[in-house]
Curated annotation (Swiss-Prot):
GO terms for biological process: lipoprotein biosynthetic process. Pathway: Protein modification; lipoprotein biosynthesis (diacylglyceryl transfer). Belongs to the Lgt family. Catalyzes the transfer of the diacylglyceryl group from phosphatidylglycerol to the sulfhydryl group of the N-terminal cysteine of a prolipoprotein, the first step in the formation of mature lipoproteins. It is an enzyme of class 2 (transferase). It comes from the Bacteria. A 1,2-diacyl-sn-glycero-3-phospho-(1'-sn-glycerol) binds at residue 133. It comes from Wolbachia sp. subsp. Brugia malayi (strain TRS). This is Phosphatidylglycerol--prolipoprotein diacylglyceryl transferase. InterPro entries: Lgt (IPR001640). GO terms for cellular component: plasma membrane.
């Protein structure tokens, strides 16, 4: 399976599918956030602040997370490569921390409930994850392990001619499309949204669990390989995420972050 990572090129400038995926994901999340703000507590200034901070958080957090967690030595030896985000190499876990920092900063600045905001963001982010994984698929990166399944694909970036799981598509569906449907169904069809933090907790639990399982079908990052108990770095980070999500969810149900909270 070989697709061009560039949509088109004009001279030395190329527009890449991976970059477009990020842009479309952010635009959709921004629009969806506005749609879900039933209490209409978000002001234009807050939206602008959150959008700017989120873009910075995604890029810095995602890129630095990848560099520091997965391949620090390589980038220390060739630091200019850190800037080449269009080649891929973005860490979801690092990006998530960046977005969390962006939300906290913007909410504190405009006195907006943090977990109310995170709950709404959790309903729109899955589409961004879907688009991002499609970008990974087009780039031919983050491919799966060798398989005999009939839907196995050959990824040139793997350096061999073996059929592999299209693990990017697994993640695109389960982390993206399926959870988008689940999160928005919970938001619109139940009263769970009244307990600020519940949707955030569910989102973190869902991602951590799905990522942990999909990692069994995904080729480990060559820079890190297998770690403790033959688990990958992605799985170890996902275990931490799942535990954190459970804590947030249970705390929300106990009304620690309920509708009476302001931050």
């Amino acid at each position: 399976m070989s697709l061009s990572p560039a949509i088109f090129s004009i001279g030395p400038v190329s527009i890449h599918w991976y970059s477009l995926a990020y842009v479309l994901g952010i635009v959709f999340a921004y629009w969806h956030l506005h749609k879900l703000d039933e209490q209409k507590i978000f002001t234009k200034n807050f939206y602008d602040s959150l959008l700017t901070a989120t873009i910075i958080g995604i890029i810095l957090g995602g890129r630095l997370g990848f560099v520091l967690i997965y391949d620090p030595i390589s980038y220390i030896n060739n630091p200019i490569e850190i800037l080449k985000t269009w080649k891929g190499g973005m860490s979801f876990h690092g990006g998530a921390i960046g977005v969390l920092c962006a939300v906290i900063i913007s909410c504190r600045r405009y006195n907006i409930p943090i977990f109310y905001t995170l709950d709404l963001i959790s309903c729109g982010v899955p589409i961004g994850l879907f688009l991002g994984r499609i970008g990974n698929f087009v780039n031919g990166e983050l491919f799966g392990r060798v398989t005999t399944m009939p839907w196995g694909m050959v990824f040139p970036e793997s350096g061999d001619n073996l059929l592999r799981h299209p693990s990017q598509l697994y993640e695109a569906f389960f982390e993206g499309l399926l959870f988008f449907a689940i999160a928005n169904s919970l938001f619109f069809l139940t009263r769970i949204r009244l307990y600020h933090g519940t949707l955030t907790g569910i989102a973190v639990i869902w991602y951590g669990t799905v990522r942990f399982v999909v990692e069994f079908f995904r080729e480990p990052d060559y820079q890190v390989g297998y770690l403790w108990l033959d688990l990958t770095m992605g799985q170890l980070l996902s275990i931490f995420m799942t535990l954190l999500g459970i804590i947030v969810y249970l705390s929300a149900l106990n009304s620690k972050f309920n509708t009476k909270s302001v931050a």
